[in-house]
Swiss-Prot record:
Keywords: Aminoacyl-tRNA synthetase, ATP-binding, Cytoplasm, Ligase, Nucleotide-binding, Protein biosynthesis. The lineage of its organism: Bacteria, Pseudomonadati, Pseudomonadota, Gammaproteobacteria, Enterobacterales. It comes from the Bacteria. Its EC number is 6.1.1.15. This is Proline--tRNA ligase. The gene is proS. Consists of three domains: the N-terminal catalytic domain, the editing domain and the C-terminal anticodon-binding domain.
């Protein structure tokens, strides 16, 4: 490629609406342009990166015998009604009517479509196992699109689906995908963790997320420094909560006899220690709206995902605000406590182990102090409802935990018979019996990978792409070609040789000042730069500059091709 024939579309200034570094650099480097909220045009530089990621994914899919297909973007709404997921996705679905007044959806995912296809296509166990995949644009009506392509209304995904006659076969394929994803992300050179996760709206029993580490990520993961333990913080359990499950049957409630002394709020000279917060949330019991109380240590954070797992809690989770608490309970939320509440009370496991603690008294400006379970208060319903912390011991016994922000770039699920039962997908067994098939599904967020790699690889000058997905691997930067025939000859000759060697190279043949040329190339992030200048050409040498460390080396012209091939691991 010659720069004179290429659309760079770089910007000098950072657009004011771009808040995170990946969004800023994708706009500045000319990878994308915003069309509307959460909707972007992909420009040539962005497309080149996307295509290289797709190629890596396709190569790995071929290794596990996955067959490429292409499913429609438009899906009949009836399929989603059959699976029961229409209400779960709710307003996130783009829905529309055709001219015949039939209802359709722009697909955010393809479980319904692919299950319907298999139901009509596969009849016998002899046709299984089967793995199919596609790379396609998906749609989701995000309420608040943000962070550029990290949370957008349309995005590109690789989604794969596997079909099996039994659970053992599904587990084998699941493990193949798990390793395949590790291979993909290692080739892309992205820092990630594979973590235990919840299946959420996808259903199924077992799932793993692949999370790219990023300070601007929306997710949080917890992992051990010393062991293989890693989990999404939503599902992470401490050793304390696991041990409680083993001993909870031995809890014997006592008759409550004593009454606790109170202490005025203004008597506390320091922040209150050993304090239990009481938080009200909405519930639905027998379809009747009501309230429940959640008890948690002052220093802990509620885990919204775990709370929604409680049957009676209203979904989505809804907290009672300050004004409502004062109206309903006659007290400010700060002084709300569990004593005397006539509603269900759920306490975190860590709260159960507390002694001589402080709670709100349900009287403004007063607390109960030195409170104990089974003495002053009946033991409530104990649940794991908080986020794990660095001070916790993980479920595998690790005492050295890290909690990091991350971006989800992949997710794999063992769906089991979740969809085949709902949509009645049966195949004939060896003995002429019919049974529901087992399914797995496996997603990679291709556009999210682009943002995640940039979040991990940049400096003050721009993006620093890994070789494997850089828009170009090598750029040739000739200086003063108009006045030096030798520079022009060497430049053209090197360009032809590199193209012949199948090296992805761009020749910067635009008539620009060196400063503009170098700034543009650094911003785009081409990893290997060859500078051909009058300063060194008389010695038959060119300057090699590596983008990731900005180090320069003089290389003989006749050795530069071998040098680059070695750098690119081509020999």
């Amino acid at each position: 490629m010659r720069a004179s024939k290429y659309l760079f579309s770089t910007l000098k200034e950072t657009p004011h609406h771009a808040k995170i570094i990946s969004h800023q650099l994708m706009l500045k480097s000319g990878m994308i342009r915003k069309l509307s909220s959460g909707i972007y045009i992909w420009l040539p530089t962005g497309i080149r990166v996307l295509n290289k990621i797709k190629d890596i994914i396709k190569n790995e899919m071929r290794k596990i015998n996955a067959l490429e297909v292409l499913m429609p973007v438009v899906q009949p709404k009836k399929l989603w009604e059959n699976s029961g997921r229409l209400s779960i996705y709710g307003e996130e679905l783009f829905q529309f009517y055709d001219r015949r007044n039939q209802k359709f959806i722009l697909g955010p995912t393809n479980e319904e479509v692919v299950t319907n296809f298999i139901r009509n296509e596969i009849n016998s166990f002899k046709e299984l196992p089967l793995i199919i995949y596609q790379i396609q644009t998906k749609f989701r009506d995000e309420i608040r699109p943000r962070f550029g392509i990290v949370r957008s209304r349309e995005f590109i995904m690789k989604d794969a689906y596997s079909f099996h006659i039994n659970k053992h076969c599904l587990e084998k394929t699941y493990n193949d995908f798990y390793q395949s994803y590790i291979n993909i992300f290692n080739k892309i050179k992205i820092q990630f963790r594979a973590v235990n996760a919840d299946s959420g709206s996808m259903g199924g029993s077992i799932s793993h997320e692949f999370q790219a580490l990023s300070e601007n990520g929306e997710d949080e993961i917890v992992f051990s420094k010393n062991t293989a333990y890693a989990s999404n913080i939503n599902t992470a359990k401490s050793m304390q909560s696991i041990n409680f499950l083993k001993e909870k049957n031995r809890i014997i409630p006592n008759q409550i006899k004593s009454k606790k002394c109170t202490k005025n709020f203004n008597e506390f000279k320091k922040p209150i220690k050993n304090f239990i917060k009481t938080i009200l949330v909405r519930t639905k019991i027998n379809n009747q709206p009501s309230l429940a109380a959640l008890l948690i240590r002052q220093e802990h954070e509620l885990n919204l995902f775990k709370i929604e797992e409680i049957d009676i809690i209203e979904k989505p989770l809804s907290f009672v605000n300050e004004e409502e608490i004062i109206t309903l309970m006659g007290v400010k939320s700060k002084f709300l406590g569990p004593l005397g509440l006539k509603i269900p009370i759920f306490a975190d496991v860590s709260v159960y182990y507390m002694k001589d603690f402080t709670i709100g008294s349900n009287i403004n400006e007063k607390f109960f102090i030195n409170v104990n379970w089974n003495v002053d208060l009946p033991i409530p319903i104990i649940k794991d409802i908080r986020n794990i912390t660095k001070k916790d011991i993980s479920s595998d016994g690790s005492k050295s935990l890290e909690i990091k922000k991350s971006i989800e770039i992949g997710h794999i699920f063992q769906l089991g018979k979740e969809y085949s039962k709902k949509m009645n997908v049966l195949v004939q067994e060896q003995h002429n019996n019919y049974k529901h098939i087992h399914m797995g599904c496996y997603g990679i967020g291709i556009t999210r990978i682009v943002a995640s790699v940039i979040e991990q690889n940049y400096d003050d000058n721009g993006i620093i792409w890994p070789d494997s997905i850089a828009p170009f691997q090598v750029v040739i930067l000739p200086l003063n070609t108009k006045n030096c025939i030798k520079i022009k000859e060497i430049t053209e000759n090197l360009y032809k040789i590199l193209k012949k060697e199948k090296i992805d190279v761009i020749l910067y043949d635009r008539n620009e000042r060196p400063g503009i040329m170098f700034n543009q190339i650094d911003l785009i992030g081409i990893p290997h730069q060859i500078i051909i200048s009058p300063r060194h050409i008389n010695e038959n040498k060119v300057e090699y500059r590596e983008r990731k460390n900005n180090k320069s080396t003089l290389i003989k012209v006749k050795e530069i091709t071998y040098f680059l091939k070695k750098k690119l691991n081509l020999i």
